[in-house]
A protein has these predicted regions:
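Short N-terminal edge-element motif at the start of the domain
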Residues: 1-3, 11
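Pocket-edge structural micro-motifs
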Residues: 14, 52, 86-88
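C-terminal terminal-subdomain/extension
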Residues: 2, 67-137
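Compact nucleic-acid interaction/catalytic patches
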Residues: 20-30, 36-73
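A broad, low-specificity signal marking well-ordered, structured residues that form hydrophobic/aromatic
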Residues: 10, 48, 65, 83-84
Length: 137
């Protein structure tokens, strides 16, 4: 099984913060996501920090990074306007079996675009503006 690395784009059943707040535990559909960070955990396991990619233009109250056309192609995404949402994220553990299917990797962003996304994500986290949605059991 291919393991995700930072800057990868995969298909994943992302659980939105509003859905989590309503008591849902499963993402309603598989969507493109970006792995903003893949880090070893203190207790073992691999921590995954997963950002949703959406074609719905974010409102002014959301924090997002628009995906340029060249990056959409690199990541294997649809040729339509897309945004990476950085004000919420799914936190999952790679070794928890639930959500990763073979062949789910669709591409990867360039190092320069990934740096832009991770910078926006870190800024949102530090400002207390990015909400974690835990996915691991």
């Amino acid at each position: 099984v291919t393991k995700p690395v930072a800057a990868d784009a995969w298909r994943y059943p992302y659980l939105w913060h509003r859905q989590h707040g309503d008591g849902e535990t499963e993402g309603r559909k598989t969507r493109p996501v970006a792995f903003v960070a893949v880090l070893p955990g203190k207790a073992g396991g691999t921590n995954l920090f997963i950002l949703a990619i959406t074609s719905t233009q974010p409102g002014r109250d959301r924090i997002a990074v628009r995906v340029p056309e060249i990056e959409r192609r690199r990541a294997g995404l649809d040729p339509i306007p897309l945004w990476v949402i950085v004000d919420e994220y799914n936190h999952d553990i790679l070794e928890s079996p639930a959500y990763f299917e073979p062949g789910a990797r669709i591409g990867a962003f360039s190092p320069s675009f990934h740096k832009k996304v991770i910078s926006a994500f870190i800024a949102a986290v530090r400002a207390g503006q990015s909400k974690a949605i835990p996915r691991a059991d």
